C-alpha cells in the first residue's frame, strides 16, 4: 500500500484545520515585541514542556533518527537520552536567565561579558540555524513528500522540491502572523498527535514483525548496543560519552531555539517544571523514532517492507503499513512536526535578528517596527535554507548525522562560555570573545575541510591537500572533545591574564555573585515534587542505558 487515500486526505485536512484554528485563537493579541517574541511571558509548564519536545522533535528526528535506526541501530539514542540536559537547564541556568529578564541568549552574554560577545553569538547562531536546523528540516519535508507522493510532479518539479517549498511557505505564513504564542500552543497540540501516531507505528510494526524478541533476533546484539568500540568510524564510545554531552548542554541549555520557551514562562516555577515535563517527553524518541527505524530494517530483511534508503524508513512505514485513516492522522502529525520545528526556528531567528542586531542599530524603533523587521528576517532565512540543501547532502550520508556533525563543530565554544561564565566569576569579556572567535574559526574550518575531503580525489594530493583532508576526516565526536578542551583553556587563560569583570556587572549572573534575594527567589520556586520527578527522570535514563548493552 502506498500513497494516501481519500479518507487519509480528509483526516489530514481536518487536522490542519484544527491547527489553523489554534493559530487564529492564539495570535489575536500581538501588540508588543514581548507578545510576539515571548508570548507575553505568560506560558504555563505543560505548554512549555510540550513546546520544548515538539520543537526538538522536528524533521531531523522523524526522518533522521528512524534513518539512523535503520542503518546503525540504537547508537543514536545517546542524543535522545539527553533529557538530563533539560534538568540542567531548569535547575542550573534558567534562574539566571529568568532573573536577567532577557529576550535572547546573546543578550545574556552581553550582560555577563560584553557587547562584542553578543554580536558574535548572534551572527553565528543565525548562520548555524540556516546551515543545520533550517536546511535539515526543509530537506526532511521534501523526503516525506518524496515517499508519500512519489508520482507528484508540477511543471517538471518533483515531489521532493514541491514538499520542501510547501512546508516552508505554509510555516512562514503562520509564524509571521502568530509569533511565539501561536508556535507554543500549536506545539502542545502536535505533541499529543506525534506521540500517539508514533506509538501506532511502533505497535503495528512490531505486530507485523512478530514481536520484540523477533526484532532483537534479526537486529543482533550490535544493533542493540549503545556502546560501540573506540575504533567505530561513526559512534566511538569515547566520543559518545564525552562529546555528545557537550553538544547536548549547548543545545538544551544555551541555544535560543530551545531556551526561548522557558523565557516565556509565567514565573520561575513554571519554567523549571516545563523543563521537567520536557525531560520526560525527551526520553520517548528512543522508542518512538529509533526503534521504528530498527523495525523497518528488520521488515526489509524479511521482505515485508520496501525501503529505498535509510532516511525513508519512517515515512515508508507510514505509507506501507498503517491502515487508512490512521495513516492520514500520522501523516498530519508528521507534516505538522516539520512545520512546528521550522516555526520555532523562524521565530528564534526573528528574535535574534530583531533584538540583538536591528534594535542595537536602531534603538528608537517602535514596537510595531520591531515585529515587522522580525517577520522580514524570516523570509531571508527561508531563502538561505533552501539554497543550502544541495550542499548538505555532500557532508554526510545520513540526515541526523549531518546535523550532529555540524553542531559538534559549533557547540564547544558556546558551551564553554556559558557554563564557565556562570560557575566562575573570574571569566571576563576578553576571554569570552577570544574563545568564541577561535572556537568558531576552528569549527568552521573543520566543516570546510570535511566538505573538501568528501569531494577530493583518492590519490595525487599535494602535502597541503593531504593536511586539509586529514583535518576534515577527524571523527566529528572526537573533534568536538578536542575543541571543547581548547576553548575552556582559552577562556581561562585569557581571563586570568586580564582584568576581572566589575562586580556590579556580574551581580546575580554567577553563583558566586548571587544576592540573598536571588537565592531566596530560587528556593521558593521548587519543592519536594520537583526533586522526586528529577530523580525519576534520571532513573529512567539509567535504565535505558543498562538495557541497551547488546
What are these regions (language model features)?
Residues 1-550:
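Membrane-embedded helix-loop-helix hairpins and adjacent transmembrane boundary segments
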Amino acid at each position: 500500500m502506498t500513497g494516501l487515500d481519500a479518507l487519509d486526505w480528509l483526516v489530514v485536512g481536518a487536522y490542519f484545520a484544527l491547527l489553523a484554528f489554534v493559530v487564529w485563537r492564539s495570535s489575536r493579541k500581538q501588540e508588543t515585541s514581548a507578545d510576539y517574541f515571548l508570548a507575553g511571558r505568560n506560558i504555563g509548564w505543560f505548554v512549555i514542556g510540550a513546546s520544548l519536545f515538539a520543537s526538538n522533535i522536528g524533521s531531523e528526528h522523524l526522518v533522521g533518527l528512524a534513518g539512523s535506526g535503520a542503518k546503525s541501530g540504537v547508537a543514536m539514542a545517546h542524543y535522545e537520552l539527553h533529557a538530563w540536559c533539560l534538568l540542567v537547564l531548569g535547575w542550573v541556568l534558567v534562574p539566571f536567565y529568568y532573573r536577567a529578564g532577557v529576550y535572547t541568549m546573546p543578550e545574556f552574554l552581553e550582560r555577563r561579558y560584553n557587547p562584542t560577545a553578543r554580536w558574535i553569538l548572534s551572527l553565528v547562531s543565525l548562520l548555524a540555524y540556516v546551515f543545520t536546523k533550517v536546511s535539515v528540516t526543509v530537506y526532511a519535508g521534501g523526503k516525506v513528500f518524496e515517499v508519500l507522493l512519489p508520482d507528484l510532479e508540477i511543471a517538471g518539479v518533483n515531489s521532493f522540491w514541491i514538499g520542501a517549498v510547501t512546508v516552508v511557505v505554509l510555516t512562514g505564513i503562520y509564524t509571521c502572523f502568530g509569533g511565539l504564542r501561536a508556535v507554543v500552543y500549536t506545539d502542545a497540540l502536535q505533541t499529543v498527535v506525534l506521540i500517539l501516531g508514533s506509538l501506532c507505528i511502533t505497535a503495528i510494526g512490531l505486530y507485523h514483525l512478530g514481536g520484540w524478541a523477533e526484532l532483537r533476533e534479526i537486529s543482533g546484539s550490535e544493533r542493540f548496543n549503545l556502546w560501540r568500540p573506540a575504533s567505530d568510524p561513526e559512534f566511538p564510545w569515547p566520543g559518545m560519552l564525552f562529546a555528545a554531552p557537550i553538544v547536548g548542554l549547548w543545545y538544551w541549555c544555551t541555544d535560543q531555539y530551545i531556551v526561548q520557551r522557558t523565557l516565556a514562562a509565567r514565573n520561575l516555577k513554571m519554567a523549571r517544571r516545563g523543563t521537567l515535563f520536557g525531560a520526560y517527553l525527551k526520553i520517548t524518541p528512543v522508542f518512538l523514532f529509533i526503534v521504528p527505524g530498527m523495525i523497518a530494517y528488520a521488515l526489509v530483511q524479511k521482505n515485508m517492507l520496501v525501503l529505498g534508503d535509510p532516511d525513508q524508513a519512517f515515512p515508508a512505514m507510514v505509507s506501507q503499513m498503517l491502515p487508512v485513516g490512521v495513516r492520514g492522522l500520522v501523516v498530519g502529525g508528521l507534516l505538522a512536526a516539520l512545520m512546528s520545528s521550522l516555526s520555532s526556528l523562524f521565530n528564534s531567528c526573528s528574535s535574534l535578528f530583531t533584538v540583538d542586531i536591528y534594535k542595537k542599530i536602531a534603538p528608537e524603533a517602535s514596537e510595531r517596527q520591531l515585529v515587522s523587521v522580525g517577520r522580514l528576517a524570516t523570509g531571508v532565512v527561508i531563502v538561505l535554507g533552501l539554497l543550502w540543501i544541495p550542499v548538505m547532502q555532500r557532508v554526510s550520508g545520513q540526515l541526523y548525522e549531518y546535523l550532529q556533525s555540524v553542531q559538534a563543530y559549533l557547540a564547544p565554544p558556546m558551551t564553554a562560555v556559558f557554563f564557565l561564565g556562570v560557575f566562575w566569576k573570574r571569566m571576563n569579556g576578553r576571554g569570552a570573545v577570544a574563545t568564541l572567535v577561535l572556537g568558531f574559526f576552528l569549527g568552521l574550518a573543520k566543516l570546510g575541510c570535511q566538505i573538501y575531503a568528501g569531494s577530493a580525489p583518492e590519490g595525487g594530493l599535494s602535502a597541503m591537500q593531504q593536511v586539509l583532508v586529514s583535518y576534515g576526516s577527524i571523527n566529528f565526536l572526537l573533534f568536538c572533545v578536542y575543541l571543547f578542551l581548547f576553548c575552556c583553556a582559552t577562556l581561562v587563560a585569557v581571563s586570568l591574564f586580564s582584568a576581572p569583570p566589575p562586580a556590579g556587572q556580574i551581580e546575580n549572573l554567577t553563583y558566586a555573585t548571587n544576592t540573598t534575594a536571588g537565592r531566596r527567589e530560587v528556593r521558593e520556586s521548587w519543592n519536594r515534587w520537583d526533586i522526586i520527578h528529577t530523580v525519576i527522570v534520571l532513573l529512567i535514563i539509567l535504565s535505558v542505558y543498562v538495557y541497551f548493552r547488546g
